[in-house]
């Protein structure tokens, strides 16, 4: 049966992504001096204004104003004409320390039964997802959408298309036969630009020099693919001048483009004690290893935690009818192989390292440089599950 699925992405200059990057740059600055920093940093961006709030408890000495200016300048916000001037924008610091009530649960000073163990930083549910649609074990529509805005940013930074500005959004619709992507049926691409080029020039350039080269490796474009390029006809006003930005408003872009479920918690600006982030990374790690181990074609992992408790209150594995062993046996293997305590997740995925700003654009998943994208548990999973395999051999 033919079906369609659509996902979107946004550029590094999108106002919400500007905020995500500032929040994660603050986190990195803290972790680089104090790996045990407790950070929950939120950023708000509006016309000529960056406001940084949240809770930060750290021994690090950081300059929030300079961090915000550096991030904005790196993106390309160096003039009010393009949406923000990093040098002249106002930066307000409204941060304060983490609540001691939360801290005692995180650091093992809460209820006696959990004494001495790192507890989850909050309650919540987290999901991880993996599938065989792409080499990255990610949904094809989202990876295509990321590819368009990432390639546009590369051309902009290299000045190969000199009239490009930082703000942009993409959206890609993929046609499926079953769970197999067969073609791209539509591409929506809105790219901020200087006022000088004509719409005809903009449309032709964006299609021929950005969209087609970015998506050509997929082999999914065809003569019937429809292109919707800057559909309003003009996109000169962008960035925080055009739209307010806020940390954590692009959680679907950050994860699976809507194909996998989301627990609701955002990632950027949060240290690894916040299971919204760390457990979502672990859930992806588990799901990807299950699919890479050929135990299922598609897999979704749900974890749930209670604040201050040093282990998950639930684990659920969903394989959408594609498993080569029972889900109960896969779940048992996961419990045996993966350390799902907050402290264990941090150790396994090296989450005290200051690498978070690079996660804040083009998705937290499907990018091989991150530890949660490793497939180093494949053999362990295969050994644990092979005796219980259903019809069809589990590949080595």
Swiss-Prot record:
GO terms for cellular component: cytoplasm. Pathway: Amino-acid biosynthesis; S-adenosyl-L-methionine biosynthesis; S-adenosyl-L-methionine from L-methionine: step 1/1. It is found in: Cytoplasm. K(+) binds at residue 42. Transmembrane segments: none annotated. PROSITE patterns: ADOMET_SYNTHASE_1, ADOMET_SYNTHASE_2. Mg(2+) binds at residue 16. Its cofactor is Mg(2+); K(+). One of its GO terms (molecular function) is methionine adenosyltransferase activity. It comes from the Bacteria. Keywords: ATP-binding, Cytoplasm, Magnesium, Metal-binding, Nucleotide-binding, One-carbon metabolism, Potassium, Transferase. It is an enzyme of class 2 (transferase). Pfam families: S-AdoMet_synt_C, S-AdoMet_synt_M, S-AdoMet_synt_N. ATP binds at residues 14, 167-169, 234-235, 243, 249-250, 266, 270. It catalyses: L-methionine + ATP + H2O = S-adenosyl-L-methionine + phosphate + diphosphate. Binds 2 divalent ions per subunit. Binds 1 potassium ion per subunit. Belongs to the AdoMet synthase family. HAMAP family: S_AdoMet_synth1 (MF_00086). Catalyzes the formation of S-adenosylmethionine (AdoMet) from methionine and ATP. The overall synthetic reaction is composed of two sequential steps, AdoMet formation and the subsequent tripolyphosphate hydrolysis which occurs prior to release of AdoMet from the enzyme. This is S-adenosylmethionine synthase. It comes from Treponema pallidum (strain Nichols). The gene is metK.
């Amino acid at each position: 049966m033919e079906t369609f699925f659509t996902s979107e992405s946004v550029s590094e200059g999108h106002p919400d992504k500007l905020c995500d990057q500032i929040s994660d740059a603050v986190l990195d600055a803290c972790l680089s001096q104090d790996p045990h920093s407790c950070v929950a940093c939120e950023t708000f961006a509006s016309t000529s204004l960056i406001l940084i709030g949240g809770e930060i408890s750290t021994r690090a000495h950081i300059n929030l104003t300079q961090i915000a200016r550096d991030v904005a300048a790196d993106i390309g916000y160096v003039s009010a004409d393009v949406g923000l001037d990093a040098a002249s924008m106002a930066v307000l610091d409204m941060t304060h320390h983490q609540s001691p009530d939360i801290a005692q649960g995180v650091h093992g000073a809460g209820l006696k039964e959990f004494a001495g163990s790192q507890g989850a930083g909050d309650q919540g549910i987290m999901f991880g997802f993996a599938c065989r649609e792409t080499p990255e074990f990610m949904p094809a529509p989202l990876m295509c959408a990321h590819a368009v805005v990432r390639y546009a940013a590369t051309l902009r930074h290299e000045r190969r298309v000199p009239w490009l500005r930082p703000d942009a959004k993409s959206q890609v619709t993929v046609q499926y036969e079953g769970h197999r992507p067969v073609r791209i049926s539509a591409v929506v691409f809105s790219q901020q630009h200087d006022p000088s080029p004509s719409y005809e020039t903009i449309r032709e350039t964006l299609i021929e020099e950005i969209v087609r080269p970015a998506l050509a490796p997929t082999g999914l474009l065809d003569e019937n693919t429809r292109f919707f390029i800057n559909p309003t006809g003009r996109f000169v006003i962008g960035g925080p001048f055009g739209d307010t930005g806020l940390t954590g408003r692009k959680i679907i872009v950050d994860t699976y483009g809507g194909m996998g479920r989301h627990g609701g918690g955002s990632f950027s600006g949060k240290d690894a004690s916040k299971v919204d982030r760390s457990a979502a990374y672990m859930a992806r790690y588990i799901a990807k290893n299950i699919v890479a181990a050929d135990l299922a074609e598609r897999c979704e992992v749900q974890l749930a935690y209670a604040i201050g408790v040093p282990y998950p209150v639930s684990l659920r594995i969903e394989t959408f009818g594609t498993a080569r062993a029972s889900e109960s046996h896969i779940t048992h293997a996961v419990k045996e192989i993966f350390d799902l305590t907050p402290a264990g997740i941090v150790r396994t995925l090296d989450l005290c390292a200051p690498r978070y700003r690079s996660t804040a654009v083009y998705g937290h998943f499907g990018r091989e440089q991150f530890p949660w994208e490793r497939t180093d548990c494949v053999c362990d999973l295969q050994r644990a599950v092979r005796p219980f395999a259903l019809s069809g051999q589990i590949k080595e």
